[in-house]
């Protein structure tokens, strides 16, 4: 533990929202995992995760009453939280509205913050939809989560509204790998981590945006880079003025590959970057590091980066997802 802040034993709960109902859960929530790992390992925080997205079974997600029961039992088992962080894409607004009411009923004195895609898109306007919130966190949360936890620990925030603006750590290699054991079991003993690992992250059977047919038995996912240097008008990053790109080194990425292979016994890894192939040197450096691991993996890239694809294939890449944003040249311009 390396901290000048006294956050030891602070109870923090991250709640991840459900996404599409038609696909089984196969993409572990990297944001909550990274933040919870950081708070626990570096600051001694008692950080836990409630992953509502893990309960999409047989074409349905949790009902509101089921979510209430799950959150209630989690709070009883781990203690009332000082801080609750909601996380989800912009499509999760209705869920966040409902969960915020549940949290406020069960833990009236908790500091309640929303972060992630929805919060970054709406900013302070999110308070209009979710008045129960004490704070809205914009951008990346690696650094500001400590500030948020410190604010939650004090009692000066009552009746106040906070907007936090997150930046990106200068060295992405310094961020601890997400500890997937935070998802190992829920409060009822359900083995969520094994459920995720057993569901293919991509491929025809995943029933998500990928239609390619290939086989995997155990798969995990993580992120190796953030942002994008391009400024495409049709992309949400361009619309938000985000052109800040950062990537972990090839060596750091290879270490996480090894960890997942050895610890979780996976035969496929999904690197869920927005755009993996931007850095040519990193792709070149990866080949001798990943090739001996004999692991299949997939990621996202642009079609005009196809020069990198043979190198990626040599390193074990068997799947590349790309977005057909528009068939109109004028829109793409």
Task: Please tell me what each predicted stretch does.
Residues 1-13, 18-20, 154, 158-221:
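N-terminal [4Fe-4S]-dependent radical SAM core
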Residues 14, 86, 114, 138, ...:
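Conserved beta-strand positions
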Residues 181-333:
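Radical SAM [4Fe-4S] cluster-binding motif and immediate context
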